[in-house]
């Protein structure tokens, strides 16, 4: 299986989800001066910001990470978290990234996710990488 890369704000909701998921993952640093480079294909797990609109939905740290062409070339899919209070725009960072990077939006979950979300993502990530490797 290939990598997961994620960002979590200081609320740690996405981080807690990733810990419960229990799959190998790399965290995009909170400190915008710290940078990481990913050398293998990955699925990005990202929270949505901004109270429900598309403007400001993608965290700055994620934008900076994806503006590195090396990292952007390796993204294969996106999973988004958000808050259902945002209505139709909950998890919209996933939509923004999927459109801009030309990758599928694979799943969305609320806040730190439920056990059902954990099970769905584990299964879905495994199936996604298997399908991708068969089509390569």
Swiss-Prot record:
Reading the lineage from the top rank, the first entry is Bacteria
Annotated GO MF terms: FMN binding
Q: Name one GO biological process term.
A: protein modification process
Q: Which InterPro entries match?
A: Flavoprotein-like_sf, RNR_Ib_NrdI_bac, RNR_NrdI
Q: What does this protein do?
A: Probably involved in ribonucleotide reductase function.
* PANTHER family with a match to the protein in the record: PROTEIN NRDI
Family as reported in the entry's similarity comment: Belongs to the NrdI family.
Protein name per Swiss-Prot or TrEMBL: Protein NrdI
Q: Which species does the entry assign this protein to? A: Salmonella dublin (strain CT_02021853)
């Amino acid at each position: 299986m290939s990598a997961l890369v994620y960002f979590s704000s200081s609320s740690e909701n996405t981080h807690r989800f990733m810990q419960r998921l229990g799959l190998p993952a790399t965290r995009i640093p909170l400190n915008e001066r710290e940078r990481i480079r990913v050398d293998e294909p990955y699925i990005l797990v990202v929270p949505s910001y901004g109270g429900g609109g598309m403007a400001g939905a993608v965290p700055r740290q994620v934008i900076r990470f994806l503006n590195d062409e090396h990292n952007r070339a390796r993204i294969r899919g996106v999973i988004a978290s958000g808050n259902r209070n945002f209505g139709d725009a909950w998890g919209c960072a996933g939509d923004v990234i999927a459109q801009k990077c030309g990758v599928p939006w694979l799943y969305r979950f609320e806040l730190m996710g439920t056990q059902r979300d954990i099970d769905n993502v584990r299964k879905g990530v495994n199936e996604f990488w298997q399908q991708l490797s068969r089509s390569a």
